[in-house]
Design a protein with these regions (language model features):
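A long amphipathic alpha-helix within ATP-dependent nucleotide-binding catalytic cores
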Residues: 154-168, 208-270
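Glycine-rich, pocket-lining loop/helix-strand segments that form or immediately flank
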Residues: 123-145, 205-231
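A short, polar/proline- and glycine-enriched secondary-structure boundary/capping micro-motif
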Residues: 119, 203-212, 282-286
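Beta-strand scaffold of nucleotide-dependent catalytic cores
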Residues: 107-109, 181-197, 206-211, 271-276
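Short, surface-exposed beta-strand-loop junctions and turns on beta-sheet-rich folds
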Residues: 114, 200-202, 278-280
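C-terminal active-site "lid" helix and adjoining low-complexity regulatory extension at the edge
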Residues: 23, 247, 265-307
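Membrane-proximal basic amphipathic "stem/tether" segments
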Residues: 1-57
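Active-site nucleotide/adenylate-binding loops and adjacent lid/helix of ATP-dependent enzymes
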Residues: 56-58, 63-180, 188
Length: 307
């Protein structure tokens, strides 16, 4: 309880700083995590490259693509409407959500959320009156989050109009507590490798992580294991739709120096998750320094420095 209150107290001045001086905010947060300042003039690794891109390049296109509702139009424009998870609706007010018309099970998401505490699986058959009251309060809180990018200097979120979306709930694989999330790192339109999240906890934060190449070779040596980000005891099975995932990622990432294309595999099909431009705010601590440098080099070769 005290930790939550402290976070709330600290968040306000930090949010103000993030809105008015995002470079200072980023430097301070990076220093707190890595005990050194980032090289923003000549980035050397993927973290520093992401920080550079979000602070010093045109990110106006990111806003539509970071919006979980608006990005659906982009996916359709790229000829991939068939990989969109069926949508039940999108609403700007909680009172407008027709819960009685929705199926027994579905998932709710904040269109401007990062998935950590801003999505909720709903099973109407298990909901009490108190549960419905709590759910509506939670959704109202999501809609009140209008400056979520300020704390990390992420400009793409400031222009998103908050909404609640409801989607079909995809079935999970046997032995998994959540859908396996296949995240493809793409640099200048070319897929590079997979970051795979499995057995994600309900809090949205704790998850098993794995690094795989495009041939599904497993590379635990590229990861830093922690209590929050453990590794699976064994490599995950090769996805049935591996080649299709790579094709989809290539199509969706075309034209961007760096983006992570997040996909699911369910019922023998590829499904779109989201596009992520600022993974962990550009402060990833689950990759080794060497692997971060290797990935960063794929991006920086073709960038024009402006700092």
């Amino acid at each position: 309880m005290f930790a939550d209150r402290l976070k709330h107290i600290v968040a306000k001045p930090l949010s103000w700083l993030g809105e008015h001086s995002p470079v200072t905010m980023v430097r301070l947060r990076y220093l707190a995590r890595f005990h050194r300042l980032p090289n923003l003039k000549h980035p050397k690794d993927l973290n520093e490259t992401i920080l550079y891109l979000k602070l010093f390049t045109d990110t106006s296109a990111w806003t539509r693509l970071a919006d979980k509702y608006q990005v659906r139009q982009y996916v359709t424009e790229r000829g991939l409407a068939d990989i969109l998870i069926p949508l039940y609706g999108a609403w700007e007010r909680v009172e407008d959500i027709p819960f009685g018309e929705l199926p027994d099970r579905f998932i709710l998401k904040a269109n401007n959320g990062d998935g950590k505490g801003t999505n909720r699986v709903v099973d109407k058959t298990q909901m009490s009156d108190a549960d419905w009251t709590d759910l509506k309060k939670e959704l109202q809180r999501w809609l009140s989050l209008r400056h979520i990018g300020a704390l990390a200097g992420e400009p793409q979120y400031s222009g998103i109009r908050p909404m609640i979306i409801a989607e079909q709930l995809l079935p999970t694989d046997v032995g998994q507590s959540s859908l396996v999330d296949y995240k493809l790192w793409c640099f200048h339109g070319e897929p590079h490798s997979f970051l795979v999240c499995s057995n994600r906890k309900e809090n949205g934060h704790d998850t098993c992580l794995g690094c795989y190449d495009l041939d599904w070779g497993y590379h635990p040596e590229n990861m830093v294991v922690s209590a929050r980000y453990p590794q699976e005891p064994e490599p995950l099975p090769r996805p049935q739709c591996l080649e299709e995932m790579i094709r989809v990622a290539r199509v969706l990432s075309d034209g961007f120096p760096e983006v992570r294309v997040d996909l699911y595999e369910s019922q023998g099909r590829v499904w779109f998750g989201e596009l992520t431009f600022t993974s962990l705010c550009g402060m990833m601590n689950y990759y080794t320094p060497g692997y971060l440098r290797e990935m960063g080099e794929r991006v920086v070769e073709s960038l024009e420095w402006r700092v």
